């Protein structure tokens, strides 16, 4: 058996894998166990009662978290004309059309989010095999294909997170940094859950939000008692 690291031993001692913790207790536990030499992200996994094999039960969207994510986000925008100027004024690091596409093809992808105006999709569409596997392909459902690119840039900079369920029906995303105030982490999580519940597929049967777990970048997951969250109302 592989030798457990000191951190993993501490996590096993502190975290009861069979227990769903009060949200405040769960956050306190994460903060206590976050001993990495960098400020770890706080991530969430939400198990949904959907059948991901059916297209009408897939959940996908985006939300600007009330307290942001704590990340500096670099934004690339495919657009032209007045929209290009608006995107730059909104804070986009990279703005262009064919010239920006050539950078992407050359492997120059120093950005975290890609936004496109509808008229630019003829250019972006040819980059699907590069952007798609990296989760960067713009999509109307996440607000990254839009005529109002300036607003999309501002949302990305303000702490918007995009989400979609994986093949097991689980949503994975971030809700902030471990050095966030506990109340801010709780409110970010609640805002995400409200957004997910608004998107419950009509075809989904039974319990929709089955399990909520939070973790840090280098830590184990801590299950959260949903009854301690405002979003359960």
UniProtKB/Swiss-Prot annotation:
It comes from the Bacteria. Keywords: Repressor, Ribonucleoprotein, Ribosomal protein, RNA-binding, rRNA-binding, Translation regulation, tRNA-binding. GO terms for biological process: regulation of translation; translation. GO terms for molecular function: rRNA binding; structural constituent of ribosome; tRNA binding. Signal peptide: none annotated. One of its GO terms (cellular component) is cytosolic large ribosomal subunit. NCBIfam families: rplA_bact. Belongs to the universal ribosomal protein uL1 family. Binds directly to 23S rRNA. The L1 stalk is quite mobile in the ribosome, and is involved in E site tRNA release. Protein L1 is also a translational repressor protein, it controls the translation of the L11 operon by binding to its mRNA. Part of the 50S ribosomal subunit. This is Large ribosomal subunit protein uL1. The gene is rplA.
